[in-house]
A protein has these predicted regions:
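Glycine-rich phosphate/pyrophosphate-handling loop used in enzymes and phosphotransfer proteins
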Residues: 1-181, 185-218
Length: 218
């Protein structure tokens, strides 16, 4: 439903430059520019990581930082379809496969303020490309906490502790989960989410972050 609405309102526009295009959601020029960005890939994670693999698509800088901020805070939801397409190209490049996609949830307060969960939008468009089902309400935010962006690396670890919970754990037991987040800084949020998924029987968790800004952590 989300895809149909956005496609109807914003047909044939590149989510990066805004130019009209005939196919895809990213024009050839922008695609070539984005190919120069270096992704961060960990196929064997650190001992303190609860996820099994990590793929971060773009550094949190330049045009991608600008587009993510526009998507999150300027209500430019159509950018999510380009982000979904770019994510699909990267997971295809590394042959990453999963049984389900699960977006990192946000609090009810943040949902009220913004009106949507940006990671859920990205996951829904990614699902259109990779044909993997999204479990939108399987992982939930169980309590409100402070904004991660205002905290130090050590404070972030404490801030997200026990902030997430799994509903319907039978759906993820023995399954490989692709966990979708918008921005990873220290990895505290995505690691805590992965911990909960593993706690309730997920076989493997592949963490995917669209942008990364390393400030110490995993």
């Amino acid at each position: 439903m989300i895809k149909k609405i956005i496609d109807f309102l914003f047909p044939n526009y590149c989510g990066i430059c805004g130019n009209k295009i005939n196919t895809s959601y990213t024009c050839e020029k922008c695609s070539n520019i984005l190919e120069c960005y270096k992704e961060r890939v960990l196929m064997h994670t650190a001992s303190n990581a609860h996820f099994d693999k990590l793929l971060c698509l773009f550094e949190y800088s330049g045009i991608m930082k600008q587009k993510m901020l526009e998507f999150k805070f300027s209500d430019k939801k159509y950018i999510s379809r380009t982000l979904g397409e770019l994510t699909f190209k990267k997971i295809k490049k590394y042959d990453l496969q999963a049984d389900y996609l699960i977006p990192v949830p946000i609090s009810k307060q943040r949902m009220f303020e913004r009106g949507y969960n940006q990671s859920e939008y990205i996951a829904n468009f990614l699902a259109e490309f990779c044909k993997i089902k999204v479990l939108n309400n399987c992982l939930i935010k169980s309590r409100n906490n402070s904004k991660q962006s205002l905290l130090s690396a050590s404070e972030r670890q404490h801030n997200v502790k026990n902030a997430y919970a799994v509903k319907n754990p039978e759906k993820i037991k023995g399954k490989t989960i692709m966990l979708i987040d918008d921005i990873m800084t220290t990895g505290a949020t995505i690691n805590e989410c992965a911990k909960e998924l593993k706690k309730y029987g997920a076989k493997e968790v592949i963490a995917i972050a669209l942008l990364y800004s390393v400030r110490g952590g995993i």
